């Protein structure tokens, strides 16, 4: 499964493309950070980020788009920018008929590190290890986008294997994946526990 992860931001938007396989291994395809000037007009900035995402979607043809879910922040201008870019990304995915996976930062951290409160360096370190990279992906927007893609791929894979229950819209069953029978990694098991705990608080 090829997944395009988006760490939404108006000044810097991380976009990472990852192939995730039935055995839960993952391979880096591409990663970029789309940047806009804070002094540019808002509509031009939104267009620039949208065009950057669209270019990578066109080039790599993902089957799923994974986006960080907007959550409350004290900085209103920051959360507004994140929400605006999230909207741009969602519209682009809908136009192409792509599945969308939304994950909170704590879900992503738990998926790749086993700890929902991991810091940026811990996330980048685990992303590099999972993808077999010689160096940590930088800046943080890039590693966060890759972590989102990995999280979405592992969740879809676990849903297919019946580990996480009912498949989500991002999980389209294939016989090869269902037959693999591989259990979750330690990080995946921790993510599942975090997800169940979150559901219990709803």
From Swiss-Prot:
Keyword annotations:
Cytoplasm, DNA damage, DNA recombination, DNA repair, DNA-binding, Endonuclease, Hydrolase, Magnesium, Metal-binding, Nuclease
Q: How is the cofactor bound?
A: Binds 2 Mg(2+) ion per subunit.
Annotated Mg(2+) 2 binding lies at 68
- The UniProt gene name for this protein comes to ruvC
Q: List its EC numbers.
A: 3.1.21.10
* Function (record text): The RuvA-RuvB-RuvC complex processes Holliday junction (HJ) DNA during genetic recombination and DNA repair. Endonuclease that resolves HJ intermediates. Cleaves cruciform DNA by making single-stranded nicks across the HJ at symmetrical positions within the homologous arms, yielding a 5'-phosphate and a 3'-hydroxyl group; requires a central core of homology in the junction. The consensus cleavage sequence is 5'-(A/T)TT(C/G)-3'. Cleavage occurs on the 3'-side of the TT dinucleotide at the point of strand exchange.
Q: Which family does it belong to?
A: Belongs to the RuvC family.
Q: List the PANTHER family.
A: CROSSOVER JUNCTION ENDODEOXYRIBONUCLEASE RUVC (PTHR30194:SF3)
Quote the subunit structure annotation: Homodimer which binds Holliday junction (HJ) DNA. The HJ becomes 2-fold symmetrical on binding to RuvC with unstacked arms; it has a different conformation from HJ DNA in complex with RuvA. In the full resolvosome a probable DNA-RuvA(4)-RuvB(12)-RuvC(2) complex forms which resolves the HJ.
Which is a Pfam family this sequence falls into? RuvC
Coarsely, its chief localization is cytoplasm
Q: Where does Mg(2+) 1 bind?
A: 7, 141
Catalyses which reaction(s): Endonucleolytic cleavage at a junction such as a reciprocal single-stranded crossover between two homologous DNA duplexes (Holliday junction)
Q: What is this protein called?
A: Crossover junction endodeoxyribonuclease RuvC
Species, as recorded: Clavibacter michiganensis subsp. michiganensis (strain NCPPB 382)
Enzyme category, top tier = hydrolase
Give compartment(s). Cytoplasm
Which cofactors? Answer: Mg(2+)
Q: Which InterPro entries match?
A: RNaseH-like_sf, RNaseH_sf, X-over_junc_endoDNase_Mg_BS, X-over_junc_endoDNase_RuvC
Active site residues per record: 7, 68, 141
Any GO CC annotation of this UniProt entry = Holliday junction resolvase complex
């Amino acid at each position: 499964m090829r997944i395009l992860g988006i760490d939404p931001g108006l000044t810097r938007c991380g976009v990472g493309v990852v192939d995730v396989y039935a055995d839960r291994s993952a391979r880096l395809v591409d990663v970029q950070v789309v940047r806009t000037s804070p002094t540019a007009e808002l509509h031009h900035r939104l267009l620039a980020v949208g065009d950057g995402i669209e270019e990578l979607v066109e080039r790599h043809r993902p089957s799923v788009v994974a986006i960080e879910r907007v959550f409350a922040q004290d900085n209103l201008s920051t959360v507004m920018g994140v929400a605006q870019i999230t909207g741009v990304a969602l519209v682009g995915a809908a136009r192409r008929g792509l599945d969308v996976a939304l994950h909170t930062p704590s879900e992503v951290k738990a998926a790749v590190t086993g700890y929902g409160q991991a810091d940026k360096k811990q996330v980048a370190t685990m992303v590099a290890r999972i993808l077999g990279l010689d160096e940590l992906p930088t800046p943080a927007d890039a590693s966060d986008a890759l972590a989102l893609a990995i999280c979405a791929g592992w969740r879809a894979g676990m849903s297919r294997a019946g580990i996480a229950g009912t498949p989500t819209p991002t999980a389209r069953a294939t016989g090869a994946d269902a037959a693999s029978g591989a259990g979750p990694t330690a990080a995946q098991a921790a993510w599942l526990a975090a997800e169940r705990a979150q559901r219990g608080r709803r």
